[in-house]
Amino acid sequence: LSPLDDQSVPLEVAPLVSAINGLLNRLKDSIATQKRFLADAAHQLKTPLAGLRMQADLAQRENSSATELKQSLQLIGRASIRATHTVNQLLALARAESGGNSLARQPCDLVELAMDVLQDSLPRAMDKRIDLGYEGVETGSPGVKVDGNPTLLKELMRNLIDNALNYTTSSADHPGVVTVRLLADRFGHVVVFQVEDNGPGVPEAERDLVFQPFYRALGTEADGSGLGLPIVLEIALQHQAQVTLEPAHPGRAMPGARFSVRFTSLT
């Protein structure tokens, strides 16, 4: 995709050549981005699949004890779950990116959707001993409906809650807390969905990077594919919503993170 020579063209066609070169440069950048994404996706899948193969080989050794066999099968199960999660996230990102104008929309009560996702997330929160709760307006309140796709909106909420649970830990000295919140301004036609935690937070230098595919916050060993927040951003864009990230508790040793998604509500 080499640019056209714009030095020896007639003055009349110079703007056209410049526009074509701009288009070629954007196309070149897009292709490079897709190549990086595919390479990252292949790497993310290669790691758990390599683990599956290694543990399968170990399980087939003739001298393997029952304990070793059980351990190998457990590791195979974990690796398969990780690979499946990555594939599901890739599919979710593809669905979000392909939405566009063809997105099937309907009036959606964000409180109702949030309650459904919260119920699904409670078992995992309980396993991690994290206090997962809700604050804000109630189902059916004025100003909480948006024009959107309920499946994708639930995916957005689920990924934000999963992200908070991934990066929040709980101990006797520091109980983990994740709060889901919905704020509505019926007169300003704005409804905001928030997920707030009291985990380590995201350094200011990384707050834009976390929305890039496969980016993982530095210095963390949290579970995840690195696709959850890019999915959130893409779904928000499809719904003309804005996503912001800020510390939940500035100044604390564990400042936490607060993700806010600002929608335009239906009248």
Mark where each language-model region is.
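Short helix-loop "hinge" at the ATP-lid/N-box region of the Bergerat-fold HATPase_c
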Residues: 164-165
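Glycine-rich ATP-binding loops of the HATPase_c
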Residues: 240-251
